[in-house]
């Protein structure tokens, strides 16, 4: 990384205490770049549009950063790398919070769609789990998940 930036290795470690911290910050940065806010904010007013956008961004991420969404890159922080794990959890929580916001403000969702057992938070968690599964399988076709949304929420 230092060579690519044209700086010394020592200068990189002025900003990061360890390689694990550097890798964690890099992974966080890539997730943020892939899922940066779209120019069209309407994406966040409609659950179907949001999911379609997320899957488009996942496909973009796969093309832009080949191999990023492999099991290795999703799970590399399991071995005693607390800062990296914390960063990944913060990034994922941000995505989950965004999904919850969309679900709670989507005017198309039936008034009785959510219950005490089937909350917007639980639906967001399921949608996020399906997204992670799709990432690992490199399947960027949201057709099935969009149909699930239509049948359960609209």
Can you name each region flagged by the protein language model?
Residues 1-21, 25:
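Helix-turn-helix
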Residues 11, 15, 57, 61, ...:
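Amphipathic alpha-helical interface segments
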Residues 25, 39-64, 120-124:
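Hydrophobic alpha-helical connector segments
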Residues 28-35:
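Short, basic, alpha-helical segments at the C-terminal edge of helix-turn-helix-like DNA-binding modules
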Residues 38-42, 69-80, 134-138:
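Secondary-structure edge/capping motif, primarily at the C-terminal ends of alpha-helices
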Residues 59-98:
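Short secondary-structure transition hinges
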Residues 71-72, 127-131, 149:
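Short alpha-helical scaffolding segments that buttress acidic/His motifs in well-ordered protein cores
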Residues 80-81, 92-124, 153-154:
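Hydrophobic alpha-helical bundle segments that form small-molecule/ligand-binding pockets
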